[in-house]
């Protein structure tokens, strides 16, 4: 597994995103299939993946606890935990709630420190909440206490908002949504440039846009397969992101062993995109964008809907129909 350096620490180019573990039905609810998910984590660890990204609310709050249990068999200093303070859940809470959540996260993860701690899902409104709660001072205080090693932000908004935040607070790293579709569609290019200009390492989420860039439609996929028959469609998305020198690690929410093995193959002995590869990818993107898909990653941050609409499910069905033409 390729590594990139962060403050003299080797960080795996592939990071394990712990929001999309395999699940199974249990008492009418979808719960993490712990046996299958642990196999994935064990395989990733054995292959050199050392960055594990979770959050307070992932898998209905089950992700952190499962991750802590699954990783306790390994030396704590051999891997990094990344988790997040859920700013978006704290609109009506006071500062004391941050302490409760942080203590709960340490307990769930079975650790006395968190390597990478982020303010979660911050947009323009969340930025105001951060200021009101004193959340930035809180995470820096935890860093001073030795309970957090590095502080960052998980960002969801425009480059203009990101620039305002970076002008206000200093972060050790920043996590953004970046992939070859959002490079222009959501101006991830400018967000990345802002970080590069300031020398801030970039952690990437949604490199395959919730799985949409792992399949594309048959015409766009055919362009990529013709150019590199041995490579998966998803590998093009991972290589696009990994070709950016300011990227520290690429988070992928791997649900199956095939997905994990494909990413391991792509990012072990990584080969950057050539000029010819970029031309091929641009052709495929042009074909794919003509389909008129809805740019939804399936993150579920829009839920719950006040009138009960299953928004991500409906978007997913629409996109599948649009891409496959109901074949």
Region spans (language model):
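N-terminal binding-site loop/beta-alpha segment at the start of enzyme catalytic domains
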Residues: 1-79
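Conserved, mostly hydrophobic/aromatic
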Residues: 14-16, 44, 52, 67, ...
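Glycine/proline-rich, positively charged
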Residues: 24-25, 32, 90-208, 215-222, ...
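Structured C-terminal cap/extension of enzyme domains
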Residues: 45, 50, 69, 168, ...
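Short catalytic-loop micro-motif centered on adjacent basic/acidic residues
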Residues: 51-57, 149-153, 175-176, 249-251
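Short beta->alpha linker loops
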Residues: 58, 62, 156-157, 255
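Alpha-helix-loop-beta-strand connector modules within alpha/beta enzyme cores
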Residues: 64-83, 136-146, 197
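A short, structured active-site edge motif that brings together acidic residues
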Residues: 77-90, 119-120
């Amino acid at each position: 597994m390729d590594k990139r350096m962060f403050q003299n620490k080797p960080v795996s180019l592939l990071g394990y995103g712990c929001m999309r573990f395999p699940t199974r039905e249990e008492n009418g609810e979808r719960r993490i299939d712990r046996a299958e998910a642990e196999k994935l984590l064990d395989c990733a660890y054995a292959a050199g993946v050392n960055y594990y990204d979770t959050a307070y609310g992932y898998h209905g709050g089950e992700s952190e606890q499962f991750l802590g249990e699954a990783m306790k068999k390994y030396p704590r200093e051999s891997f990094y935990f990344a988790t997040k303070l859920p700013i978006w859940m704290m609109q009506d809470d006071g500062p004391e709630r941050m302490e409760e959540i942080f203590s709960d996260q340490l307990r769930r993860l079975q650790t006395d420190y968190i390597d990478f701690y982020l303010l979660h899902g911050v947009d323009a409104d969340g930025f105001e909440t951060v200021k009101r709660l004193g959340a930035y001072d809180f995470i820096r205080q935890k860093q001073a206490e030795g309970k957090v090693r590095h502080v960052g932000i998980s960002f969801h908004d425009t480059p203009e908002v990101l620039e305002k935040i970076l002008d206000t607070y200093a972060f050790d790293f920043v996590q953004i949504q970046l992939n070859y579709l959002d490079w222009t569609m959501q101006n991830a290019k400018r967000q990345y440039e802002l970080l590069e200009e300031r020398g801030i390492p970039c952690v990437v989420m949604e490199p395959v846009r919730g799985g949409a860039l792992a399949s594309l439609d048959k015409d766009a996929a055919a362009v990529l397969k013709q150019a590199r028959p041995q490579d998966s469609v998803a590998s093009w998305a991972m290589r696009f992101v990994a070709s950016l020198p300011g990227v520290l690690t690429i988070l992928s929410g791997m649900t199956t062993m095939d997905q994990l093995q494909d990413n391991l193959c792509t990012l072990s002995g990584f080969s950057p995109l050539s000029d010819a590869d970029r031309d091929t990818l641009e052709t495929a993107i042009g074909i794919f964008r003509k389909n008129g898909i809805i740019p939804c990653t399936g993150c579920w941050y829009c839920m719950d809907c006040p009138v009960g609409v299953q928004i991500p499910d409906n978007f997913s069905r629409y996109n599948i129909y649009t891409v496959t033409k109901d074949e």
